[in-house]
C-alpha cells in the first residue's frame, strides 16, 4: 500500500501482465467449462456493471492495459481511506494498535471512495450456447437474487441447500440417483454486495441432452414455488447452515475465519460484531418465506440458460440457444 508505486517499473508491470495472462489461460481458457462463468455474468449484468466480468479480466484488456492506468487505479483504491484491517487471536489490543500505527500510520489516507450503485435486471429469458473441449454437456441456469445480507439472501442460500446438498436433496435424488440422467448437480446463492445471482449447474450423463435436465430442474423449482420445502428439509438445511457458521469461526484466520468475518461485517455493514444477527437471518426463515422467494426470484422468463457442449455436438444444447464467444 505504501511502497508499491515507486518500485513498479515498466519491466515489472509487463512481467506481471504475463503472469496474469498465463493464470487466465490455466484457470479459465484451457480448463474444461472454464469460460462458463464468464459467459454467464456477461449475460446477467450490463456491460458497464462491475459484475459483468470476472476479476481476472479479459485477455484483450490485459494486453491493452498500461502502467499509467495501473498507477491511477492503485492511487484511487489502494489506500487507508478505502481499506479495513481486522486483527484476531491471542494478542494485546494496545500493542496491536501500536503496530498498525507503526506500519501504516505514515501512509497518506488518500481520496474517499463513495459507494457504487448499479442496477441489473433481465427483461426476458437468455439462451446461450458455448462449444468447449469437454466430454459431457453441462447446463448452467442463473437468476438475479437479493444482495448479500439483504432480505431474501438467506432464503435463497437455504433453497440451494434443499435442491442439491446431499444425496436426499431434491435435484440430486431426482437427476442423479433416480433417473440417472446427470452425473452431478450443484446449486449456489452467489452472495455479492451489489446484487447476487442464484445458480444451478448440472452435468448430463452420457446419452442425455440438456433439455432433459432442464425439464427436471424446472419441475423441482415449480414444486418449491407451489408449496415450499418440507419442514424436515428446512430443518436439515438450517442445521447445515448453523454447523457451517460455527465451523468457520473455529479458525482465527483464513477465508471465513474470525478475522475475515469481522472484516466483512465491518466493510459491508459497518458492524464488525454482526455474528448473532447474521445467524439469525437463517433462523428466522420459514417454509413460507422460502416458498415466497422461489416464486419471486427463480422465474423461468428472467433466467440465463447456458448450454456448454462438446465441440460439434450442438444438438445436445437447449433449443434456440445462440452461440456465445468468450474473450
Describe the residue ranges of each PLM region.
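Bacterial peptidoglycan biogenesis and beta-lactam-recognition machinery
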Residues: 7-10, 93-94, 104-110
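Short, polar/flexible loop-turn hinges at active-site or ligand-entry regions and domain interfaces
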Residues: 3-11, 27, 226-229
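Helix N-cap motif at beta-to-alpha junctions
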Residues: 90-94, 206-209
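Non-catalytic beta-strand/loop surface segments
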Residues: 27-82, 102, 106-150, 161-212, ...
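Zinc-dependent metallopeptidase catalytic helix centered on the HExxH motif
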Residues: 153-154
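Short amphipathic alpha-helices in soluble, non-transmembrane regions
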Residues: 1-2, 98-104, 213-219
